[in-house]
Amino acid sequence: MTSKFTLSTARPKGPLALIATPGARELTELVDKNLVEWYKSVDVDGSLKKDTFIIDSACPRFTNGEGKGMVMETLRGKDLFVICDVANHGVTYNFFGKEIPMTPDEHFADLKRIICAANCKPERITVVMPMLYEGRQHRRAGRESLDCAQMLHELYDMG
């Protein structure tokens, strides 16, 4: 029988790291603030002292709409949590001189770019999505695609 999960029994695979995709910055900062406070409360000898767990990253876009993912710090051996809010339509980008809101598909593409930029170096990657991408479709009708299932397969195959 497995033991009950609690914060004291949960062990990270390595040092914690957080990455916010575009549109998830505020949520990631709230999570980071709570983690820093919690680490300070359980840190007896000062070895866990950390000001932030957020890793500097970016998903810039070119004027034709193409994008790329960039991670500015090493993730080797870290327990990485990537936070992605695919339902945030408040994020815009410049597309041939016009500001265009990001769609859930573009948020998901940025998530995959960040995972690729991590280059399989973290010890573990966990994706946190407040709203599951394409999660509104609960059954197949006719010849429809099952995008949520496809997305989960893609993320699983990425490692």
Please place each PLM-identified region on the residue numbering.
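PRPP-associated nucleotide enzymes
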Residues: 1-159
